[in-house]
Amino acid sequence: SGYENGYFRPTASTTRQQLWMVLARLSGTRPADMAMARQWAINTGVSDGSNPSGVLSRQQLLTMLYRYAKSQGVNVSASAKLTGYADSAAVASYAKEALSWAAAKGIVSGSNGKLNPEGTATRAHFAVFLYRYSHG
């Protein structure tokens, strides 16, 4: 659920430390706390560990998921042209390769012809992206 009261809160935003904890657990690591999850993220190259409570954008989340996949030995060479999305110019240079991979793998498909890369990554987005990654 993620919250003490058992709620998932799908519309809540995803923070960096939440992402680090989930990805660390997915890798088989069992961090005892957020500080250990942060260190795991740094050690694996998923993140530089900055701004743990910072809210993630969709492109930031997908970039860290891409780095996670790479750190796990997943072939991340798939790519799709982003120019078919009306807001492709809004994709940050650091995130282009990751979003291209995520689009090619069906992890992200956009909505109404847009990727919304700068939009807030909700917990629902994270759950969908992670499901598609795990089952793709």
Language-model segments: which ranges?
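Feature responds to low-complexity, polar/acidic, surface-exposed segments characteristic
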Residues: S1-Q60, L65-A95, S109-A121, R132-G136
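Phosphate/pyrophosphate-binding loop motifs in nucleotide- or prenyl diphosphate-using proteins
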Residues: G106
